[in-house]
Amino acid sequence: MDYRVLLYYKYVTIDDPETFAAEHLEFCKENNLKGRILVSTEGINGTLSGTKEDTDQYIAHMRADERFKDITFKIDEAEGHAFKKMHVRPRHEIVALDLENDIDPRETTGKYLSPSEFREALEDDDTIVIDARNDYEFDLGHFRGAVRPNITRFRDLPDWIKENKEVFMDKKIVTYCTGGIRCEKFSGFLLKEGFEDVAQLEGGIATYGKDPETKGELWDGKMYVFDERISVDVNQVEKTVIGKEWFDGTPCERYINCSNPECNKQILVSEENEHRYLGACCKECAEHERNRYVAKHNISDEEKEKCLENFKETVQQ
């Protein structure tokens, strides 16, 4: 595998995000890289793919900048590019929590736990482990015993915490996310909310899965990633499938977007059921005039009607 995927972030002052983003995009394109990078006055958050040579060049370029000299890159081997295009965009935040009073992780954040320390926390009955990711990420894979917030966007997490504050307030809290960036702010938010004992998995799931001591133990399922790979393995010791097929509840790790472009809900679906239900999450979406699955596969009106009949056998109507 000659390609690699880089995942990284750094909370650091960038005075002119717009100019930085434009110049950075040019550099990335010149070096054949593809991916998504967000830049703001609070720092940089990126994931990109390229050949080993091109990603080495990128790492060297970043570390030559005093602001990013100690940045940590999480590196995965890949068969090819994990993205179709290269985007570098200026944003208000590099991870959107949308708080009235923003959190600066350089000033307020939870205690950092190494992978081995985090594993101890997972096995501690007195510790509450909260997944800081979205529900569809959790449903594909998570740490054993972790709490699943009922959210589809990171910015909804503070409200969920406030609604459940009494359940967690006097507990030891440990949180985790994909690469660590969300927990930097989320753990800081918890401290601002009055939680006293707050810690986070340093480097996130991506680091835990590659740790030679923990080897990804106590992780079930796969880790959702925001690129064309969709998911990657974490647990090097044992393989478990915890995802459940949207229609029949059987074990499944295959995510698709609902074929209704106005819905786009992410659902776990087998190839057989994707065809059986026209790539949709419900009958209403299957009937949509701009159903992408119908258009892509040139489904006839007669075949479409047969597929719509299948919804009579399911609760997803």
From Swiss-Prot:
Record domain Rhodanese: where: 123-217
Q: Where is the signal peptide?
A: none
Enzyme Commission code: 1.14.-.-
Q: Which domain of life is it from?
A: Bacteria
Keyword field? Oxidoreductase, tRNA processing
GO biological process annotation, one example: tRNA modification
Please state what class of enzyme this protein is: oxidoreductase
List, from the UniProt record, the residues annotated as the active site of this protein: C177
Q: Name one GO molecular function term.
A: oxidoreductase activity, acting on paired donors, with incorporation or reduction of molecular oxygen
Annotated catalysed reactions: uridine(34) in tRNA + AH2 + O2 = 5-hydroxyuridine(34) in tRNA + A + H2O
Entries under NCBIfam families matching the protein: PRK00142.1-3
Q: Which HAMAP family match?
A: TrhO
Family, similarity comment: Belongs to the TrhO family.
Task of the protein: Catalyzes oxygen-dependent 5-hydroxyuridine (ho5U) modification at position 34 in tRNAs.
What this protein is called in its record is tRNA uridine(34) hydroxylase
- In its UniProt entry, the species of origin is given as Staphylococcus carnosus (strain TM300)
The gene designation is trhO
